[in-house]
Swiss-Prot record:
Residues 343-404, 417-508, 530-631 are annotated as: Disordered. It comes from Mus musculus. The modification Phosphoserine is found at residues 3-4, 101, 249, 375, 473, 494, 506, 515. This is Shootin-1. The N-terminus region is necessary for interaction with actin retrograde filament flow and accumulation in neuronal growth cones. Expressed in hippocampal neurons. Residues 352-369 have a biased composition (Pro residues). Interacts with L1CAM; this interaction occurs at axonal growth cones. Interacts with actin filament retrograde flow; this interaction is enhanced in a netrin-1- and PAK1-dependent manner and promotes F-actin-substrate coupling and concomitant formation of traction forces at axonal growth cones. Interacts with RUFY3. Interacts with PFN2. Interacts (via N-terminus) with KIF20B; this interaction is direct and promotes the association of SHTN1 to microtubules in primary neurons. Associates with microtubule. GO terms for cellular component: axon; axonal growth cone; cell leading edge; filopodium; growth cone; lamellipodium; microtubule; microtubule associated complex.
Length: 631
């Protein structure tokens, strides 16, 4: 079985081998056939290429021959035309000759004419022969050559002209293209010019808007400058008021007044804080409005300028805040100084010995320097109402020196006010007129104050008079230095003088008036005078109101509480030194005379307007004088 299978397989393999060999031979034969066909096709292609090259050569030759023939035809045409032209010329010449000959024949006779006619009949044949002969002649050949040369030259010129014409056409096309380009560029330039005109119009509009906004900004800047000046003047007034508070702090010796003054200072600080907050809110509103305007603008320079203005305003705000902080610190210092002065007053009250009993006879009361000071101020403010109001008190020789001293001090203070020291105007309301009973009762305290000031030390008064003597001839700086030296010498003997001198040096020029009064009213003389008894005696013509059992009164000057200035003389059972208190502008409610009498029956009021009508701030020149009465 295996052998038979193997044989079958071998037979199959052999059969397949034979088939493969046969197929290979067939494929080989086909390959040879294709190669032969390819060779034939290559040969045909080469032959066709050769034929094409031959055809091209032949076509070029034919074209050259055609061109040559065309040229030859043109030459022949020109020759024919020239020959025809010559023939016409010859015919014309022959006709002219015939006419001439006819004339001669007419002269010769008819026989000759017949012969000539016969000759004319034979002329056409002879003409043709002559033409042939002429063409064959040397002249005709020369003319033909010349004509041919002319034809060649004319053809060359024609070619040159054709070339030039083509060049000119090409140049004309280029020129037309350039013209079209120039037209296009011109159109583009016109469009650009129109666009630039539109841009210029827009720029003009924007510049007009910018100029208007710049003018508005200038107006705002001027307003802000005015506000800044007002703020600076307000700060200067606040500084002057603080200096007033410093000067007044030297005379605060009661226990109840420091608390009130601190409350007033706190109220003023609260008002200042409110004003600063309102200004800050207004400033923020303005800044927001300016920012809203600037959001729609593209001008960075204006933004930069506005930012610089904002920085300046912020600097001003910082300065105001610093001044506010300095005012708070000064108020605190005033509080500390008030406490120290209160302690010293308590110590001095404990150390003061009991006063001796008053003597039965009383000298005539000396003049009141404060009243004279007030009368001088009233004379300057109301000169018309000064003639009907006079004082009825006598003036001894000792009192004249004190009045001269006070008068000179008042004149100096008024000179300083006139020279430009601006004081803050005090808001004074209409004050009620003083009643005769209250005036009579208050003049008893004034008489006591006159007695106190009349018995001052002569040495201090003479020294102050010497210092005030050359006032008109000396300069302001020399007077200030002399007063400070006098205050330093006068206050060096008392323990309380050190504080006064230290604070008086820190005050501005207005403090020079208070330094003069301090030099005349030092601590020792006041203690020596207040140790003496000073009962009160009413002036002639006064009411029955008296102060009994009052050994040492306390005189206080209170500011106008919506009713003007008031001066109170408060009698106390305890022995104490006199105190003069100049209180700043208070915010308390006004008290009537009945309410004041209910609170303290021994309290008398003397209004500052007893010898003059009510003060009204009608002009800016009177503000300094009313403030000087506060000092």
């Amino acid at each position: 079985m295996n052998s038979s299978d193997e044989e079958k397989q071998l037979q199959l393999i052999t059969s397949l081998k034979e088939q493969a060999i046969g197929e290979y031979e067939d494929l080989r034969a086909e390959n040879q056939k294709t190669k032969e066909k390819c060779d034939k096709i290559r040969q045909e292609r080469d032959e066709a290429v050769k034929k094409l090259e031959e055809f091209q050569k032949i076509s070029h030759m034919v074209i050259e021959e055609v061109n040559f023939m065309q040229n030859h035809l043109e030459i022949e045409k020109t020759c024919r035309e020239s020959a025809e032209a010559l023939a016409t010329k010859l015919n014309k010449e022959n006709k002219t000759l015939k006419r001439i000959s006819m004339l001669y024949m007419a002269k010769l006779g008819p026989d000759v004419i017949t012969e000539e006619i016969n000759i004319d009949d034979d002329d056409p044949a002879t003409d043709t022969d002559a033409a042939a002969e002429t063409c064959v002649s040397v002249q005709c050949q020369k003319q033909i050559k010349e004509l041919r040369d002319q034809i060649v030259s004319v053809q060359e010129e024609k070619k040159v002209l054709a070339i030039e014409l083509e060049n000119l056409k090409s140049k004309l096309g280029e020129v037309m293209e350039e013209v079209n380009k120039v037209k296009q560029e011109k159109a583009v330039l016109n469009s650009e010019v129109l666009e630039q005109r539109k841009v210029l119009e827009k720029c003009n509009r924007v510049s007009m808007l910018a100029v208007e906004e710049y003018e508005e900004l200038q107006v705002n800047l001027e307003l802000e400058k005015d506000l800044r000046k007002k703020a600076e003047s307000f700060a200067q007034e606040m500084f002057i008021e603080q200096n007033k508070l410093k000067r007044q702090s030297h005379l605060l010796l009661q226990s109840s007044l420091p608390d009130q003054q601190l409350l007033k200072a706190l109220d003023e600080n609260a008002k200042l804080i409110q004003q600063l907050e309102e200004e800050r809110i207004q400033h923020q509103k303005k800044v927001k409005e300016l920012e809203e305007r600037l959001e729609n603008e593209a001008l960075h320079k204006e933004i930069h300028n506005l930012r610089q203005q904002l920085e300046l305003l912020e600097d001003d705000k910082r300065e105001l805040e610093q001044k506010y902080q300095s005012s708070e610190e000064k108020a605190r210092n005033l509080k500390h100084s008030v406490d120290e002065l209160q302690k010293r007053v308590n110590q001095s009250e404990n150390s003061v010995p009991p006063p001796p009993p008053p003597p039965p006879p009383l000298p005539p009361p000396p003049p009141n320097p404060i009243r004279s000071l007030m009368s001088m101020i009233r004379k300057r403010s109301h000169p018309s109402g000064n003639s009907a109001k006079k004082e009825k008190t006598t003036q001894p020789e000792t009192a004249e020196e004190v009045t001269d001293l006070k008068r000179q001090a008042v004149e100096e203070m008024m000179d300083r006010i006139k020279k430009g020291v601006h004081l803050r105007p005090v808001n004074q309301t209409a004050r009620p007129k003083a009643k005769p009973d209250s005036l009579k009762g208050s003049e008893s305290a004034v008489d006591e104050l006159k007695g106190i000031l009349g018995t001052l030390n002569k040495s201090t008064s003479s020294r102050s008079l010497k210092s005030l003597g050359p006032e008109n001839s000396e300069t302001e700086l020399e007077r200030i230095l002399r007063r400070r030296k006098l205050t330093a010498e006068a206050d060096s003997s008392s323990p309380t003088g050190i504080l006064a001198t230290s604070e008086s040096k820190s005050m501005p020029v207005l403090g020079s008036v208070s330094s003069v009064t301090k030099s005349a009213l030092n601590k020792k003389t006041l203690e020596a005078e207040f140790n003496n008894p000073c009962p009160l005696t009413p002036e002639p013509g006064e009411g029955p109101r008296k102060l009994e059992g009052c050994t040492n009164p306390k005189v206080t000057f209170q500011p106008p509480s919506k009713g003007g200035y008031r001066r109170k003389c408060v009698g106390s059972e305890n022995q104490a030194e006199p105190v003069v208190v100049l209180d700043p502008v208070s915010t308390h409610e006004p008290q009537t005379k009945d309410q004041a009498a209910e609170k303290d029956p021994t309290q008398f009021e003397e209004e500052g307007g007893e010898t003059q009508p009510e003060y009204k701030e009608d002009s800016g020149g009177k503000t300094g004088e009313t403030d000087s009465s506060n000092c």
